[in-house]
Amino acid sequence: MKKLLIFALAAMGMVACVKEEVTLLPQGDAISFESAFIDNATRAAVDPSTTTATLNGFNVWGFVKEYDGVIFDGVNVTKNNDVWSYDGTQYWVPNQPYYFAALAPMNSANWGISKATDAAAKLGLGTVDFKNVDGTEDLLYAKEMMTSKGLNEPNGAVKFQFQHLLSKVKFTFKNGFPTETASIKVTNVKMTVPQEAEIDLAQTDYSKAWTSYANTTTLSFGDVEKLAYTQSAEVAYERLTIPAPAEEKQPEDTLETVKFIQLSAEEL
């Protein structure tokens, strides 16, 4: 019995030693996001583009040291009273390189992502496929690279500057009739554009990074008020479209066209 008791005490001592040797990886302050700014904000009254003021959420991806060190994988980041927050707090590991990327609108059914699987992810995130339904939904992307500071040093928040990945289209008409007694009315302005395409986020010129165009959709720009002699006016709505570079030949059924459904002249 005495031998068994001594053995049991020795075993307990070994377990205690093992527990004492377990150490935790040092961590810094919590990773946070703030001041999500959208570049090239527009000023039109009826404008579908997302602005800094109207952006209320985005999905974020984050990697530490290498691409395999995933800390965020499409996590929802939302704004409430100008404060950005997410579930499942992550903390900075001191003196490590970090890579962040974000897409908006958050959780949209019109975009999907195929993430890169190697170091190329550091240049972007992967390939995004986008479907343009009616030209009223924007597509935004941002990335940020930074190195965390030492232990007990504040890192500050990750600040994204979002870029518009789509092009904005509007039409302006001018009454060019040579007589002051003529006015014109333009109604039901439409435009046929590519509906689906993919963009490689590792590229630097996003306007030329679109490929794999498929299908078409018709965007409606509304009407133009009656134009008197030499008067100019814009269509009622602006719309967003997938960029289609002129130097890149597209399939014939996805070429952009403008349709003037009605064009009439009236006397004042």
Regions found by a protein language model. Give the residues of each.
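Positively charged n-region of N-terminal signal peptides that target proteins for export
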Residues: 1-4, 19
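Cysteine-clustered segments with highest specificity for TGF-beta superfamily mature ligands
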Residues: 251, 263-268
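Short, low-hydrophobicity acidic/polar segments
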Residues: 19-196, 209-211, 220-250, 259
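Sec-dependent N-terminal signal peptides
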Residues: 6-9
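Exposed beta-strand face motif in extracellular beta-rich ectodomains
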Residues: 4, 96-100, 266-268
